[in-house]
Amino acid sequence: MKYASKEYVYMPPTCSCATTAAPAAAAGVAFLHGLTPQQINDMLCTAQVQMAGVVCDGAKPSCATRMYVALFGSLQAMMMAKEGIRATNVEGFVHNDLKVTLENLYRLQHDVLHNKVDAILWDIVKEQKVIH
């Protein structure tokens, strides 16, 4: 994942805790457990599929819950990869190669979600009268 952060949209509409931090932490655990580079690739691809739709709606205490869910999912993906199980290229935007999976996620963020998520969240916050 050394190239993941430069591939994402600047200030991505998806939760960075869920799509970057947790999978990266789990990759470190996987490395320490002796998983091969291919198994770590498989684990990270599966982890990206699990959390790709989680949007960022601002930093707040509930982000810790998102981080926990993402880390648990990433560690589950590690256990799956250890057994040769992974998300495959017939399951949405995931590809067999992590770099291509991240490029696909970038396209999803940039072409579909970028700016739209902020506008929708702004409307929701105004409707809830949290801001004036």
Protein language model features and the residues they cover:
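Active-site nucleophile and cofactor-binding loops and adjacent substrate-binding regions
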Residues: 10-21, 66
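Residue-level detector of secondary-structure transition/capping positions
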Residues: 1-2, 48
